[in-house]
Amino acid sequence: DQVQYKQGRDTDQITLNTDSENYNTWRVKRPKELDPEREAGPISLGRYLGGGRSGIPTFARSPVALSPEDLVAGEVDVAILGAPLDMGSGWRDAIHGPRAMRMLGRGTGGADVSTMIDPGKVLNIVDYGDAAIDQLSTERSVQEVRDRVREIAETGAIPFIIGGDHS
């Protein structure tokens, strides 16, 4: 009896309370006051100078930037942004794309075979984390990705987005 839908007893829709203080918490940024004071600039998460495969994974084994101030202070050329979306994909595991790319830990892969240029040696690259994703709205999620891309571009760095799907 509890498993069957019953008109009058069960609602046929779930309403979102857009007035709730928790409605937009998926994209509320952590207040800077909660973080210890530090000089602006990219943060290296590696414990060992040799790098290796241990430690906290980042895109291309690069340092992490948390804010536009970090991008400017670090004179960053390329900021890699994760966009873990899978709402427009028939395969619902695309959301794990950015995490999987970080876990590969292969750096930039060395020199390009056509140009013989190693982007990791000529560009200052950082991991800018993931854009916040609203699992209930592709539109709101894509807007958040756009906002992070704009935030990166306004510092003069080139945004490089790794998804997810093609939402």
Label each residue range with its predicted role.
Residues Q2-S167:
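Metal-dependent C-N hydrolase catalytic cores
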